[in-house]
A protein has these predicted regions:
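Transmembrane beta-barrel architecture of outer-membrane proteins
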Residues: 76-78, 124, 169, 279-281
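Residues on the lipid-exposed face of transmembrane beta-strands in outer-membrane beta-barrel proteins
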Residues: 81-85, 195, 284-288
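Sec-dependent N-terminal signal peptides
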Residues: 4-13
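Short, charged, amphipathic alpha-helical segments
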Residues: 101, 164-175, 301-304, 367-378
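Bacterial Sec-pathway N-terminal export signals of envelope proteins
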Residues: 12, 18-61, 87, 163, ...
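Periplasmic alpha-helical coiled-coil/stalk elements that build and connect Gram-negative outer-membrane
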Residues: 20, 115-228, 328-331, 335-339, ...
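Short segments within alpha-helical structural elements
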Residues: 176-201, 346-404
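Small/polar (Gly/Ser/Thr/Ala-rich) solvent-exposed segments
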Residues: 37, 60-76, 86-113, 234, ...
Length: 407
């Protein structure tokens, strides 16, 4: 019996972490996610909108006008082609273009954030399947050991070496091991279902990782990387810059603007390319705004309020990211320390089990002592599997936070 447990310990001791196919799993999750596809097209829609609104101020307005009489009859004797172009507007056009560019970049950062969130969930789903698989193996082995104990107790009871109470205790332990195995099977099924829904395929070909996890930088380097690479912080920066450009765009509405208007009338002969530039009526208009229903004043005031809000939002984001990075980095260290502590506890439980088995054979300890010691070893093994899973998740959570993994 002890050899079986030692063999199990050797098998599980070879598992260093769950990360061999994480990159492939992340790619499949992103590729198969309907949510990501939806957000991709949402981003593309925003891209079209911001690009068109940013460029619109630089482009002319061209129209062809027809006249109708009171009976809605088309007057074919006269048509008018008009071109209007804003030449100078106090920098409003450039500010609007820059604002649209910053808003588009912020939208892109949010889309990348969605991919990071999905990637981390994919890591969790991958690790969960592996964790639940190993837990089930432990529960199945515990059930076999409990059955072996029960059989041994029955034989010893028939020989008068143990009491009926010890046999009943072994039966209770066996029944408990069955319920734990059934519970582990149910949790593994749920983990497989969650994996399928997220990744888009069954978790049949997963294997434990033998390669090392991506390296984790020191805390100061993580903080520096987060300040330059964190997607939430980048989005806040672009939002702040866009708000500043909006103030310039609204303020420019108070400044004079110079507009060009060119028009040409066409008779019944219609439009001819070779005569298109003849008799063109060109007008330059200098527009000096004085009062436009108060819209300009309120527009500037609102833009300034939005700029202040974006600035304070940026400061709050900086503080939050710093706290989150420190917390994530500490979680990595804590998970690593827990693994080491549980490994030591596992070794101690293995040695304790060996000693208790010898004492039971010498009738120095009871069967209940042996079963309790075995439970301690199984618990240490289960805790170790969970600790390694938590370590993998904490590492990827930190790496996504400092944006050191390209998606």
């Amino acid at each position: 019996m002890f050899r079986l447990i030692i063999t199990l310990a050797i098998i599980f001791g070879t598992i260093s972490c769950y990360a061999t196919d994480v990159g492939e799993v992340i790619s499949k999750a992103i590729k198969n996610s309907s949510k990501i596809k939806s957000q991709f097209y949402q981003y593309k829609s925003a891209e079209k909108y911001y690009k068109s609104s940013g460029l619109a101020g630089f482009l002319p307005d061209i129209s062809l006008q027809y006249n109708f009489d009171s009976n809605f009859n088309l007057d074919t004797s006269e048509k008018k082609l008009t071109l209007r172009q804003k030449l100078i507007d106090g920098g409003g056009t450039f500010a609007t273009f820059s604002r649209s560019s910053h808003l588009l970049k912020a939208e892109k950062m949010r889309f990348q954030q969605s991919k990071q969130e999905l990637a981390l969930n994919a890591v969790k789903a991958y690790v969960s399947v592996l964790q639940k698989t190993e837990i089930l193996k432990l529960r199945e082995h515990k059930e076999r050991v409990s059955l072996e104990h029960l059989s041994a107790m029955k034989k010893r009871f028939s020989l008068g070496e143990v009491t009926n109470a010890e046999v009943l205790l072994a039966k209770a332990k066996f029944s408990s091991s069955i319920s734990e195995r059934v519970d582990a099977e149910g949790k593994l099924k749920l983990a497989n279902i969650a994996y399928y829904h997220l990744i888009g395929e069954d978790a049949d070909d997963l294997s434990e990782a033998n390669d090392k996890l991506p390296s984790v930088p020191e805390l100061n380097e993580c903080l520096q990387l987060a300040k330059t690479n964190n997607l939430s912080l980048k989005a806040a920066v672009y939002q702040k810059r866009a708000a500043g450009m909006e103030v310039i765009a609204e303020s420019s509405k108070w400044l004079p603007s110079l507009n060009l208007s060119a028009s040409k009338n066409f008779g019944e002969d219609g439009m001819k390319v070779d005569k298109l530039l003849e008799n063109v009526h060109v007008v330059f208009t200098l527009d000096v705004p004085i009062f436009k229903r108060g819209v300009n004043a309120f527009g500037v005031s609102k833009a300034k309020m939005d700029a202040k809000k974006s600035t304070y939002d940026y400061y709050e984001t900086v503080k939050k990211i710093e706290q989150d990075v420190v917390n994530a980095w500490n979680n990595v260290l804590t998970a690593k320390a827990i693994i080491k502590a549980i490994q030591e506890a596992e070794k101690a439980a293995s040695l304790a089990l060996e000693g208790v088995e010898q004492e039971v054979n010498l009738n120095l300890k009871s069967t209940s002592d042996l079963l309790d010691t075995e439970d301690a070893l199984f618990k240490a093994r289960s805790d170790l599997v969970e600790a390694k899973s938590n370590y993998v998740i904490s590492v990827y959570n930190l790496l996504f936070m400092i944006n050191s993994i390209n998606l």
